[in-house]
Every structure is written in structure tokens, then in C-alpha cells.
Regions:
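C-terminal beta-signal and adjacent terminal beta-strands/loops
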Residues: 57-60, 103-111, 130-180
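Flexible, surface-exposed loop regions and adjacent strand-edge segments
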Residues: 1, 65-72, 107, 116-120, ...
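A cross-taxa feature marking solvent-exposed loop/turn segments within ectodomains of secreted
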Residues: 42-44, 120, 134
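Asparagine-centered polar/low-complexity signal
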Residues: 21-23, 115, 145-148
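Generic long, charged, amphipathic alpha-helical segments
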Residues: 100-105, 112-128
Length: 180
């Protein structure tokens, strides 16, 4: 609209007013599943198996004001919305020690500009080990992306999609907790 543009005496644009507009409609549906099972043995300790799985069935918005709803589930129309996402883990606790192996999964999704192309699914493994030094002190060693897996290529995001993957690759940290 002409009132959204300000020009100088020579006709050059000096200000462009861009305002967000409420599209007013969004339909979202999905399924979340969370399972957890704990096994205890007096000699071996505790083993906890856990799994969380999410499936986006529909994520629909209009592409422009007055347009019909477009389903963006499994695409990056409205930001990256993979249909599948999951985290599974196994935690073993024995005495003052505990260790967890975690598998993180993000499903593939189609490119909004080229629906015949997609960003590949991505999964990583993380390992965490903790030692309860005293009732007040705990030391934890964490390795994220244990296999140093690279984020999948996404040409629409200048290389990779930072909302779905971490560019750092393998990352280790040491955490010390002390409760006063």
C-alpha cells in the first residue's frame, strides 16, 4: 500500500513500514507418546528405559490473508515442522553412579520451495555419567552427539537448520553441582 512507503524529494524510498498481520487461523493436531519402565535388581541396580515420540498430523495456516489453509506438517512452510520426533534413553543406576545413553531423532521434512527435495532425518546419541561424591556434591560428564554426526544439509537455511540440529558436532562438558 502506498501509505506504507515514505520517499524523499527525488523519489527514493526512505522508509518502508512492514507490519505483521494476524492471519487469524491455525489448525494443529498430533500425537505424543511417553513410555517409561523401570527394572530393579538388588545386585545390578536400577535400569530405566524411556521413550518419547511425537507425530505432527496437521499444522495448517493460510499462506496469505484470505487464502485457504495449507498443511505445513512435514515441511518448512511455517518454520521446520518434521512430522516425527523422538527421544529414547536407557539409564543405569548403581550405588553412587548413574549413566544414560540417549538417542535423539528428528524426522525428514520437505523443502517448501521444492517439495520434491527434503532435509534428511537426523539422529544423535548422547552419553551422561554421574557420580554422587557426597550427599551434597555431584560430578557429571556429558558427551552430546557422541558419533560427531553433521547436521543434514538444508539449502534454504544457508547450510543447516539451526532449529533442528546443532552445528557444533560432538560436544563434551563437565558439570559440578554442590547443594548448600
Amino acid at each position: 500500500a502506498p501509505q506504507k512507503i515514505t520517499r524523499d524529494a527525488d523519489g527514493r524510498i526512505t522508509t518502508l513500514y512492514r507490519q505483521y498481520r494476524n492471519q487469524g487461523q491455525r489448525e494443529v493436531s498430533g500425537i505424543d507418546l511417553d513410555l517409561r519402565q523401570r527394572f530393579t535388581d538388588k545386585d545390578w541396580g536400577k535400569l530405566t528405559l524411556a521413550g518419547q515420540l511425537s507425530r505432527v498430523l496437521r499444522f495448517a495456516e493460510p499462506l496469505s490473508d484470505g487464502a485457504p489453509l495449507t498443511d505445513g506438517a512435514g515441511t518448512n512452510y511455517f518454520g521446520s515442522i518434521p512430522k516425527w520426533r523422538g527421544v529414547t534413553s536407557a539409564t543405569w543406576e548403581q550405588g553412587k553412579w548413574s549413566s544414560t545413553l540417549t538417542w535423539n531423532y528428528v524426522g525428514s521434512y520437505a523443502q517448501s520451495t521444492h517439495l520434491d527435495e527434503s532435509v534428511a532425518a537426523f539422529s544423535t546419541f548422547d552419553v551422561t555419567s554421574s557420580w554422587q561424591v557426597t550427599p551434597a556434591a555431584n560430578v557429571t560428564f556429558i558427551v552430546q552427539n557422541l558419533a560427531n554426526k553433521r547436521a543434514p544439509w538444508d539449502y534454504s537455511a544457508s547450510g543447516f537448520d539451526y532449529t533442528q540440529a546443532d552445528p557444533r558436532g560432538r560436544f563434551a562438558s563437565l558439570k559440578l553441582n554442590y547443594k548448600f
